[in-house]
Amino acid sequence: MYNGVLLLHKPVGMTSHDCVMKIRKLLKTKKVGHTGTLDPEVSGVLPICVGRATKIVEYLTEKSKTYDAEVTLGCSTETEDQTGEVTEKKPVLAPPDEQTVQSVLRSLEGTIEQVPPMYSAVKVGGKKLYEYARAGIEVERPKRTITIHHIELTSEIRHEGDKARFRFVVTCSKGTYVRTLAVTIGEKLGYPAHMSNLVRTASGPFTLDECLTFEDVEGLIADGTLSEKLVPIERALDHLPKWIISDTLAKKVENGAVLETPGSFSHLTSEDRIAVFTEAGRCTAVYYPHPTKTGLLKPAKVLVQKSEQ
């Protein structure tokens, strides 16, 4: 049985769900789930939780993401990326200089509001926005607050015919639409624009150079060494506060017991989570402050069973 996080280099042309289904077939298990959707035309880091690690999916989806994106100035599309029909054109006679572009990018750093694109899976009135879009209906979309941690120009600005292109790297919070960001960048530069290429280079602490292709996965399965390449749950939860417990407490944890909050964690809020480790270094559960009983911690996820201790 495989347990851990498989860092997949998602190829262009597959949905995230397609990737999960293929991994299920390759590993011969239904216990597989991804940690954040990538559109079919986007490649890059797609962490896939396998086996017992499917219990920690929600703690990985919250992490920031890093993307390498290309913006094309001179035309916008209905999908805000290279796959959609062109909706507006404006020839780029003289492209903006690097200083101007960098200034626009820097103006987006911090907390900003973003309206999700019509071609997205965000739900409004019980339906996904892309369902309205495909029916030719445009609906009002609620603004979302996102955080741009860092954004930077990474290429020269290329003037190609009546268009201009450049690349940038952005590290942003969960829920950020980089194609909408590309449109916003274009607006600030005075042109209709769209995102013409996107690669996710990092998801939380996981980077592209750690990822496996499907071909890699198949080879490792054949060699019997795939388990060695899976990220252990312990590393995957490294961003959470760590509580090392005694073997006596570990017995209670495996039974899902409510525990007293140690003094070092008395400052926690209801949103915080703690990774509980045994003295041997194994992560056995994730706990959080009890919603109604002050001074107590309650299990959010128990990651081991008695038979596994």
UniProtKB/Swiss-Prot annotation:
Regarding protein family, the annotation reads: Belongs to the pseudouridine synthase TruB family. Type 1 subfamily.
Q: What name does UniProt use for this protein?
A: tRNA pseudouridine synthase B
Q: Where are the transmembrane segments?
A: none
Domain of life assignment: Bacteria
Reactions the enzyme catalyzes: uridine(55) in tRNA = pseudouridine(55) in tRNA
One Gene Ontology MF term: tRNA pseudouridine(55) synthase activity
Gene (UniProt): truB
Q: HAMAP family annotated for this entry? A: TruB_bact (MF_01080)
Native source species? Bacillus licheniformis (strain ATCC 14580 / DSM 13 / JCM 2505 / CCUG 7422 / NBRC 12200 / NCIMB 9375 / NCTC 10341 / NRRL NRS-1264 / Gibson 46)
Which keywords does the record carry? Isomerase, tRNA processing
The annotated active site, in chain numbering, is 39 (nucleophile)
InterPro entries given for it?
Answer: PsdUridine_synth_cat_dom_sf, PsdUridine_synth_N, tRNA_psdUridine_synth_TruB, TruB_C
Q: List all disulphide bridges recorded for this chain.
A: none
GO terms (BP aspect)? mRNA pseudouridine synthesis; tRNA pseudouridine synthesis
Which EC number(s) does UniProt give? 5.4.99.25
Taxonomy, top ranks, is: Bacteria, Bacillati, Bacillota, Bacilli, Bacillales
Q: Which CDD domains match?
A: PseudoU_synth_EcTruB
Please indicate if the UniProt record lists DNA damage as a keyword: no
Write down the PANTHER family for this protein, in alphabetical order.
PSEUDOURIDYLATE SYNTHASE TRUB1 (PTHR13767:SF2), TRNA-PSEUDOURIDINE SYNTHASE (PTHR13767)
Gene3D superfamilies reported in the protein's UniProt record: Pseudouridine synthase
What's its job? Responsible for synthesis of pseudouridine from uracil-55 in the psi GC loop of transfer RNAs.
